[in-house]
Swiss-Prot record:
Binding site for Fe cation: C96, H138, H142
Cofactor(s) listed: Fe(2+)
Xref: InterPro entries: Peptide_deformylase, Peptide_deformylase_sf
Annotated S-S bridges: none
SUPFAM superfamilies recorded: Peptide deformylase
Gene3D superfamilies: Peptide deformylase
A single GO molecular function term of this UniProt record: peptide deformylase activity
Lineage, highest ranks first: Bacteria, Pseudomonadati, Pseudomonadota, Alphaproteobacteria, Hyphomicrobiales
CDD domains reported for this sequence: Pep_deformylase
Name used for this protein in its record: Peptide deformylase
Catalytic activity: N-terminal N-formyl-L-methionyl-[peptide] + H2O = N-terminal L-methionyl-[peptide] + formate
Function: Removes the formyl group from the N-terminal Met of newly synthesized proteins. Requires at least a dipeptide for an efficient rate of reaction. N-terminal L-methionine is a prerequisite for activity but the enzyme has broad specificity at other positions.
Cofactor detail note: Binds 1 Fe(2+) ion.
Active site location: E139
Organism: Rhodopseudomonas palustris (strain BisA53)
């Protein structure tokens, strides 16, 4: 496993549409391992491969670790897709490792049904709600070149982007804060 650098806005790679994973190879498993290590180190609860400059449809997630009880439940989703969504919506405050130190309320479908392949090559369909639904939608958005700030007002999005563009021009490097 290796720690990888997380790219941040305004990096144009974050706007790429990621390519499907053709086969679950040792290289894909190694990439997932690197993503878990990077996600835990950041710390975060989800990471899309494009966030470490790998434009493939792979997501890692661990929602259990967020609870701070020392337990983990790492999950990898290869070629995930939303195949159904509720009309009911829910608002969660979202953040992103690629947009450090910024959070905003985002409205998304409250429940979604997803299809994905696991690291053993098995295809699954699963219903997601609550934080899981929000997180999987957020990460799938990354695979499609969409950021959570695309779901907020144009004015707020412009202010956020201006902040990061100015910082990038000055050479300032945002580093996610470590938690104790």
């Amino acid at each position: 496993m290796a720690l990888r650098e997380i790219i941040i806005v305004p990096d144009k790679q974050l706007r790429l549409t990621s390519k499907p994973v053709e086969t679950v190879s040792p290289e894909v498993r190694k990439l997932a391992d690197d993503m878990f290590e990077t996600m835990y180190d950041a710390p975060g609860i989800g990471l899309a491969a494009i966030q470490i400059a790998e434009p493939v449809r792979l997501i890692t997630m661990d929602l259990v670790r967020k609870e701070g009880n020392g337990k983990t439940e790492p999950r990898a989703f290869i070629n995930p897709e939303i195949i159904g969504a509720s009309t009911e919506t829910r608002v969660y405050e979202e953040g992103c490792l690629s947009i450090p130190e910024y959070y905003a309320e985002v409205e998304r479908p409250a429940q979604v049904r997803i299809r994905y392949t696991d690291l053993d090559g098995h295809v699954h369909e699963e219903d997601a709600d609550g934080l899981f639904a929000t997180c999987i939608q957020h990460e799938i958005d990354h695979l499609n070149g969409t950021l959570f700030i695309d779901h907020i007002s144009r004015l707020k999005r412009a202010l956020v982007m201006r902040k990061f563009e100015k910082a990038a021009k000055r050479g300032y490097k945002f580093v996610p804060a470590k938690t104790a």
